[in-house]
Amino acid sequence: MDLTRRQFVVGCSSAIAAMAGGRLGGLAFAEPGDINRDIFVVVFLRGGCDGIGIVSPLDDANFQAARSTITFPSSGTGAGFELGSLSNVPFWLHPKAAAFKELYDSQDLAFIHASGLTNGTRSHFDAMDFMERGTPDNKSTSTGWLTRHMAATRPDGVVPVMSTGSALPASLLGSPNAVTISNVQRYAMQGYSTYGAQQQASLNEIYSQTGSLLDGPATRLLSSIAAVKARNPANPYVPITTYPAGGLSDSLKAIAQMIKLDVGLQVATLDFGGWDTHESQVPILGNQLDLLTRSLHAFYNDLVDYHSKLTIVVMSEFGRRLKANRSAGTDHGHGNLAMVLGGNVNGGRIFGRWPGLANAQLDHGVDLAITTDYRTILSEIVVRRLRNNRLGLVFPQISQYQPLGLVRGTDLTIDWTSGFRSYLPMARR
């Protein structure tokens, strides 16, 4: 049929509005997802969180000498929570992380200390880029590690991958499957609701005839909007637990809602910034931890029916310097703390190997050394929980699979074939 000028204008305006409401990275949707697939949520703490200030070796003389003015006590008022030992060194959890202590005691939460990006950069942007592309020392990698993981597993589902930010993170760079959704109720054609059906019909008609490279992505975006709308009631989402107020909780609720809509969500990412504590670290870190731990605790309880297939990892680009600075803060460091939460996590433990805090044991004599590459943590989750053995593709620079025992699952025969060069162009449309 011939398009009228009115159809063209309505369709184009709605297309622009639709793209603003749900940005995409070259979507590729299929049939609804396998309900047995695991769900993986990545929480990135932007700014370099102070891992050694969250899980601390309070009895260590070197630690006290470096941080006595900015740490918490092991007993008395404001005391931390005892966690147990790593490498025969006892550790305490920050007192503002009480919600994490509950998850730790229920054996759903594990910590991995002295972990992180082995590249020595102290640049926020370089470190985040290296980590999220999954190729330390190589910023020219044109895809993110989660993009390559999803390519290896041939994702199905209406919305297999989502991010709650305004743009996709580098871990989803080049993804043909990912959308950004910060508010599920607003994931729709924007404009007057009276004309919503007409706008969508016009846009479908335009893209069915143009033959442009945008046809596939636009049509798939419309399909995802229609599928979410069909499953999503008009009323705001009502969780089964109470979340604290704030943007972090809003992002977590959006993910929880998408999981419950059964649209085949397999991977979700979100960012939580504000961890660059160069000054006044005690109040800032305490407030950040309180919000992070209570929000994740609420999110986990909200998804109680999904615990058996839910894994959450929390990480940051680097840790902080061991010694406090003159502004009652800490500067950019190296070794850090990662956290893994889920129904198949071997929680209630601290994993890794503690390197010590004597000068000779520190990285460059000033920072906590790294004894566990962050890719070791992610690789175990990818293999045992996400059932992907293509580590050569996901993390092309590693050559060994050395699980720590973080999560339960089957160790597959690892395929070290990278397939990296052939995949980089992302020519699939």
Language-model features, listed with the residues they occupy:
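Glycine-rich and small/hydrophobic secondary-structure elements
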Residues: H334
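Histidine/acidic-residue-rich catalytic or RNA/ligand-binding cores of hydrolases
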Residues: N325-A328
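Short, solvent-exposed mixed-charge patches
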Residues: R428-R429
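Conserved functional hotspot residues at active sites or interaction interfaces
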Residues: P425
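Acidic/histidine-rich, metal-coordinating catalytic segments
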Residues: T311-G319
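Short structural boundary motif marking the start of a folded domain
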Residues: R421-S422
